[in-house]
């Protein structure tokens, strides 16, 4: 009737600070659209997304940029790494966009690189890494900006089962250290 395809309807949830919140459902059920609505990578046609009483849907472009640069980060299913940049540059990309000096962002990127278990891989290019290692780089890039909120859109679904399990364990270990608010999207009921 409206000319729109309804991908997400009547969804309401609350995530506490430091909580890991999992959205699980079948492929095609709107999970990825939901997480993209939270970050406004997809523009919702109705409703609200509140972060500390601030409505993301009502934010101006400038406010949205600030939210994405300083309070929120996202880890994608297909890594989203920049192939022409070394691992250390991929990790520091969000800090570069913020205007952080090169030396400072490389120090931060190296710190996070160690945190995700990729010491010594900073000067390599994404094509030189396995899928699991590339996903660790994506995770490190998200952590480097020290966000309050991390959104994960099926980050491990492209990985083989053994690597997937390792990455799940790694994420749980990291969460016990960094205590970020995490929204995790998956279709895999074993995750």
Sequence positions of predicted segments:
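Conserved ABC ATPase "signature" region
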Residues: 1, 52-55, 92, 96, ...
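ABC ATPase NBD coupling module
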Residues: 1-3, 56-73, 97, 102-106
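Helix-to-loop junction immediately C-terminal to a conserved catalytic motif
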Residues: 39
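Short coil-to-helix segment of the ABC ATPase nucleotide-binding domain corresponding to the Q-loop/switch region
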Residues: 85-92
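Conserved ABC ATPase signature
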Residues: 125-129, 133
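A short, proline-enriched helix->beta-strand linker immediately N-terminal to the Walker B motif
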Residues: 144-148
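Catalytic Walker B motif of ABC-type/P-loop ATPase nucleotide-binding domains
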Residues: 150-153
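Conserved H-loop
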Residues: 179-185
């Amino acid at each position: 009737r409206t000319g729109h395809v309804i991908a997400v309807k009547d969804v309401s949830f609350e995530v506490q600070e430091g909580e890991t919140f999992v959205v699980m459902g079948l492929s095609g059920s709107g999970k990825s659209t939901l997480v993209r609505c939270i970050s406004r990578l997809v523009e919702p046609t109705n409703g609200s997304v509140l972060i500390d009483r601030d409505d993301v849907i009502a934010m101006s472009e400038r406010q949205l940029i600030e939210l994405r640069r300083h309070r929120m980060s996202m880890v994608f299913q297909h890594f989203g790494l920049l192939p022409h940049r070394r691992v250390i540059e991929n990790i520091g990309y969000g800090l570069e966009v913020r205007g952080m000096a090169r030396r400072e962002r490389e120090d931060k990127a190296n710190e996070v690189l160690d945190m995700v278990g990729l010491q010594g891989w900073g000067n390599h290019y994404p094509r030189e890494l396995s899928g699991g290692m590339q996903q660790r780089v994506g995770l490190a890039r998200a952590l480097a900006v020290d966000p309050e909120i991390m959104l994960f859109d099926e980050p491990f679904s492209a990985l083989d089962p053994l690597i997937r399990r390792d990455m799940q364990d790694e994420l749980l270990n990291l969460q016990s250290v960094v205590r970020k608010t995490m929204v995790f999207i998956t279709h895999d009921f074993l995750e």
